Amino acid sequence: MYRLIKQEGRAKRGEFTTVHGVIQTPVFMNVGTVAAIKGAVSTADLEQIGTQVELSNTYHLHVRPGDRIIKQMGGLHKFMSWNKPILTDSGGFQVFSLAGLRKIKEEGVTFRSHIDGHKIFMGPEESMQIQSNLGSTIAMAFDECAPSKADRMYVQNSVERTTRWLQRCQVEMKRLNSLEDTVNPHQLLFGINQGAIYEDIRIEHAKRIAEMDLDGYAVGGLAVGETHEEMYHILDEVVPYLPVNKPTYLMGVGTPANILEGVERGVDFFDCVYPTRNGRHGHLYTNHGKINLFNAKYELDSRPIEEGCGCPACQRYSRAYIRHLLKAKEMLGMRLCVLPVSYTHLRAHETGAYL
């Protein structure tokens, strides 16, 4: 259940109550694709830096180790020792990114595993079943993420199919949540708005899915080739048609500047792999801009990565030391970069310093 605490313009502050705890929004979700944050960051670390929600990937966990194995282990929360909310994406983005390896039909998508090439079929029901086996707090509906510059007719047909798939997801989740052996009988469902860069298609789709009384709504298919200006324009046009009394999630977007722009437009949830991916390579966001620890000027820099940061890395280690670890290819160097960048992103919506 979502409670709107305060609203200024379109910007919202809210509380989203789930079976695994209350989420204060706006919120940035740390991305643990295969149930772990890359860079040797543990769930204990996530708790220490104040992570509210972790995001894992349905497709990757289905392929390895297998969602049925995770169910036998008691669900994803027990498997990764994390007691707070988890959001699982539907696997759709990964499936549709395998352009040469998949075939789309009304029933779903047939594609080949990126690991060993074996054939996999995934449709709305299969995606819901996998996410039910994982037992995540929030499950995302199965959708098609059409390329941002795709032909208008293709996008229109894709969106209509995505709407039908959402209806099937809703029916299947209701069935799965009623089963005696389900891992999480209180699993929530978010629908996804699509439509590439065609604002009229997106607006009509937003109106249709808003009528379905879902637990939350996402704006998908952005940050996949369009400009920032196009993305912000789509948000300006679409978000007003999504229910203000439900959380809004901007999928795959999460630089500090993007977060602030999204919050201003009424977005509650964000996620992005780039902060930790860049951090593992020594490229970090700070309150004073981006830094590259491989630059020679940090060789004798005794300051922490971020002055005043509460993460373990900044509380104890210097830029010079972390730079040394990165150049020596020590795993600890990646870890000590990922911690502060994660800490910073968890709080990016609290400050305008990045703009």
Regions found by a protein language model. Give the residues of each.
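Cysteine-cluster motifs in flexible loop/terminal segments that predominantly coordinate metals
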Residues: 287-335
